[in-house]
């Protein structure tokens, strides 16, 4: 789960890291109250989970409460790369002398944690690494030992931080690691980590991602979810314990197993190129226990998306045999009818694996005109794309 900047700032503050005084506002009136509390010159920053806010006009300076209200009014409601601004963060300004970069992240490729540090802060770190790689230090972190003062000093020194800030930077690095671990984060990034004219260090930006798989250890993280940005179908699927992600397409996808579903997305996208460019409408993994109730819930979620014109059910029978899945599909359609959900869009079903022949026979015997059985994955994807294109 990616946090907004103000949420990351608050998280850093809770862990004792030096951040700017500020607050978050959803209305110009709230912005006025924050500006009056802070006093003097402030920065008004759009809260969206994309970069490029400054170039889009989403970051503005303001002097006094009236100007802060005007800036907040301009920014609230803006569209920045498809994201509507619902909140602004308002902080005091800082007298910045130098800018550095510091982050910890989960390095999935190497199955470890990674620290990245640079004296070239305030810029895109990937650009810095590409153009001046000598300015970027990358240090693997052993999860068993973590980051203590000695290791932090080694990283900070290698990165070339000025001698006068090394001690402070070491303290920040250690505390930031503690926050990273305590919150089960997959990324904490500070860009820039600034040295002020008075010589102190401040974390002027906060980019934080939390591991949703560790949410059971952090009931407080639930409050960080932006309900206004949550897709209602994804929320409904979550409540039914379904792994669903909405996409921008016309072919609904239901499969058992994340790997199979990902492959299904690929073959449908490829087939769709030959049928008007139709695309997968979602990712939905119903897991191994494809009971009638689970299948009905899955179909209900997928068919609740008005952009879906056809549904591709792709199942490889393993522990759950294909005949059980086929019965689940037939019963699911009947169950949806009982719920008052009139199903009119076609289902293309491909079954393979354990008891596939028996499952196919069940589908054929159901004589349901909505069910079209295709026995190959490519053929089923082709048919689903064709039906979706015809229904668009």
Swiss-Prot record:
Superkingdom, taxonomy of origin: Bacteria
Domain ATP-grasp, chain residue ranges per copy: 9-236
Enzyme Commission no: 6.2.1.5
Ligand binding (substrate): 256, 318-320
Needed co-factor(s): Mg(2+)
InterPro entries cross-referenced by the UniProt entry: ATP-grasp (IPR011761), ATP-grasp_succ-CoA_synth-type (IPR013650), ATP_grasp_subdomain_1 (IPR013815), Succ-CoA_synthase_bsu_CS (IPR017866), SUCC_ACL_C (IPR005811), Succ_CoA_ligase-like_bsu (IPR005809), Succinyl-CoA_synth-like (IPR016102)
Pfam family, one: Ligase_CoA
Pathway: Carbohydrate metabolism; tricarboxylic acid cycle; succinate from succinyl-CoA (ligase route): step 1/1
Cellular component GO terms held in the UniProt record: cytosol; succinate-CoA ligase complex
Binding site for ATP: 45, 52-54, 94, 99
CC cofactor note: Binds 1 Mg(2+) ion per subunit.
Binding site for Mg(2+): 191, 205
PROSITE patterns: ATP_GRASP, SUCCINYL_COA_LIG_3
UniProt key word Nucleotide-binding: yes
One Gene Ontology biological process: succinyl-CoA metabolic process
Subunit-level organization: Heterotetramer of two alpha and two beta subunits.
PANTHER family membership: SUCCINATE--COA LIGASE [GDP-FORMING] SUBUNIT BETA, MITOCHONDRIAL, SUCCINYL-COA SYNTHETASE BETA CHAIN
Purpose: Succinyl-CoA synthetase functions in the citric acid cycle (TCA), coupling the hydrolysis of succinyl-CoA to the synthesis of either ATP or GTP and thus represents the only step of substrate-level phosphorylation in the TCA. The beta subunit provides nucleotide specificity of the enzyme and binds the substrate succinate, while the binding sites for coenzyme A and phosphate are found in the alpha subunit.
Name of the protein: Succinate--CoA ligase [ADP-forming] subunit beta
Organism: Salinispora arenicola (strain CNS-205)
